[in-house]
Regions:
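Juxtamembrane/disordered regions of integral membrane proteins
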Residues: 1-188
Length: 188
């Protein structure tokens, strides 16, 4: 099997941060500029941006060649699992009791599990999940701080940028981590 040269962990984190940060900025622009009326429709439109664009952007980090569509569909599935858990807890807890944090915890655990299954990685779930959760949470809550401080359109866009940079860094690391066993197996 011919594979693409594997990206380093640093490159994966930086590439994930930049690419997912830009996608997140675009997604949060829907909220920032009030482009879609109604809460359910707005969240659906934001999720659609992530579902459609993220897999295409992060595909560059996959080592298997010619997997653009397959990876994009896989990523959409993994992101959908995350989004379902996040929305379920956020809406059920009505924005209280750290529903966003609990939703992220469960959603990112599901995403990590799906990535490990897809890439055949059988070890290091806790490490991979912990790093993803940490980067995501730092980005999300730093973005929230910016929104609290600046408010309005600027605050919303900054929230999107910070959330995307943090989440993207975690996703870049997750892809690097999950592909390590595959790289080791192929290079033997």
């Amino acid at each position: 099997m011919t594979i693409r040269p594997a990206a380093t962990q640093s490159f994966s984190i930086i590439f994930g941060s930049i690419s997912f940060g830009l996608i997140s900025l675009l997604a949060y622009a829907i909220w920032a500029f009030r482009l879609v009326p109604g809460q359910a429709a707005m969240y659906s439109a934001i999720a659609a941006i992530y579902l459609i664009l993220s897999g295409f952007a992060l595909n560059r980090l996959a080592i298997a060649p010619k997997v653009l569509l397959r990876f994009a569909l896989f990523f959409a599935t993994a992101f959908l699992a995350y989004a379902i858990f996040w929305c379920l807890l956020w809406f059920q807890l009505k924005g209280k009791y750290h529903g966003d944090l609990w939703g992220s915890l469960l959603g990112l655990a599901a995403m990590t599990w799906l990535f490990q299954k897809a890439f055949g990685s059988k070890r290091g779930f806790l490490a991979a999940f912990s790093i993803l959760f940490t980067f995501h949470t730092i980005g999300y809550y730093q973005g929230n701080e910016c929104y609290t401080y600046f408010g309005g359109t600027t605050g919303r866009l900054l929230w999107g940028a910070f959330h995307g940079v943090g989440f993207g860094a975690g996703l870049g690391n997750l892809m690097f981590h999950c592909q390590k066993p595959l790289i080791e197996k192929i290079s033997k």
